[in-house]
Amino acid sequence: MLELERIANHLQDWGAICNDASFAYPHARCGLLREALLRANAIAFGHRLMMDAVIPGGVAVDIAAEGAQAIRGVLDAIAQDLPGLVRIYETHASLQDRVVGTGVLRAELAARFAAGGVVGRASGRAFDARHALPHAPYDELGITPIAIPEGDVDARARIRIAEIGTSMALVRRLLGRLEPGPIHAPLPQRGGEGIAAVEGFRGEILTWMSLDDGGLIRAVFPRDPSWLQWPLLEAAVEGNIVADFPLCNKSFNCSYSGVDL
């Protein structure tokens, strides 16, 4: 589910970057591919965005009988379209003029703010929670973070493109490993506290939680990766023309609501 969500959102963000550079075709194609993926999600998990599918101890529903076939089918469609879209993106002169060298985030700032996700990896910070803090099944998949040093809008787009391919390969591997069995485990009814890190499509999502003696939530604090990325967007737009702000903003795609959690 994490990798399917990553593919869908990276497609959306890549297309939106092109659209903010006044080049609508990739936006339209990425939108069609994302829609096809969301429909496959609905077939497999009962919800286009897979909402309420993850519960404490596991998942709420098992993948539908026809779910794996639906997901493989849409991955095949994306894999067929992706090379052509990348070629158009890389060879369209006016688009490249807008994204290359625009909104540069310096590597030292990315490191100082511990920026994760696309923002950090596009500025040379090779941190990925799937690699650094792996939970199952990532501890068996051997994730290698993709990082490049340029730090501009183009770099953030290229990281997304590369991660779409990586995530598609991971989904195929995971579908091949699925076996029948329980879909969630019973939780102990006891107190305690802990913290977890999950690599979302924007970066690492941290959640601290404290339980009372009955196992009920006493306190919880989620931290969205956008907390560390909004100040860096401010630094990245310095020296750019006003017309390039939408490009910079969309290439970061920080969450407005995430910082209010």
Regions inferred by a protein language model and the residue ranges of each:
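Active-site bordering "gate/hinge" segments
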Residues: 1-261
